[in-house]
Amino acid sequence: MVNDGLIELGNANVKIAVQPKAGASLAYFKANIGAKEVDIMRPATAKALTDSDAAGSSMYPMLPYVNRIHDGFFVYWGIKRQVPSNVSSNKEPFDGDGWKFSWNVKEKSDKKVVLTTVGDPKKGFPFSYEAEVTYTLTDSGFNTHIILRNLGILPMPCAMGVHPFFPKTKDVNIKFKAKNVWEHLGTPLRDKPYNVTSDWRFEEGKDIAKMTLDTCFGGFDGDAEITWPSNNVRLKIKAYEEFNHSILVVSENKNIFSFEPVTSAIDAFNLASRGIMGTGIKSIGPGETIEATVEFSVEEL
């Protein structure tokens, strides 16, 4: 169903609402657990719905880069590439171009929505590209499939990911496995990967409600679980193909948190230009594509 710019997909178990005009974001992801409806992701705020602002959504795609680009530039093929700020409160560009665009609906059915957009190198990321995001409803959740295509005549560096916002209950627990964590100290931030120590091990699960962190993990194996015991629900995340990094952001003073499957480290363009290995940055030639999928599925405890 299409309602005020929202495209709603649902079945007896779950439902989502896609916002083409708000960066191909989601307005909600809800599940029927027992006799009640539970918000699996933070519902879009009223202001975000009015303003078509993905920042206040349930989830948005990040492309053609993820998180921040330090000081708004990077060097590629020996050329300094400027990337303008896209957030008024931050001098550095943030989370790519896609979440700021109004997307076109390419295909729509009861179970699937396909959205497309084109990046203008004169206004944002300094390379020409086409992006496609597909949301497909499943019996227990939905899948997100992202495709990036280089429309230019030169190789294009790129990264992508998804940025969901989750409710932070007092008992929320997250479980995932990673091989390393990117350093927090120094300028620019997060410029070295270190082997994961016990403080950063989440494979057995950790309660995160009282944590404060903004951390990128490398060597992410693609599987994660978020459990809300008080809501009697668990979310399983399965990230495929290129999603070998993840970012966990938690603030003790906020009632939401994010766990973001991504293809690269934070500020990866600049890290790679300095010869740092393992950043996850990809380079695609003219006409070439990169694509990856993330699955979200809900189960009752």
Regions found by a protein language model. Name each.
Residues M1-A12:
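Short, Gly/Pro- and small/polar-rich lid/capping loops
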Residues I33, V75-I79, V105-V113, T136-G141, ...:
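A short, structured loop/turn motif at beta-sheet edges
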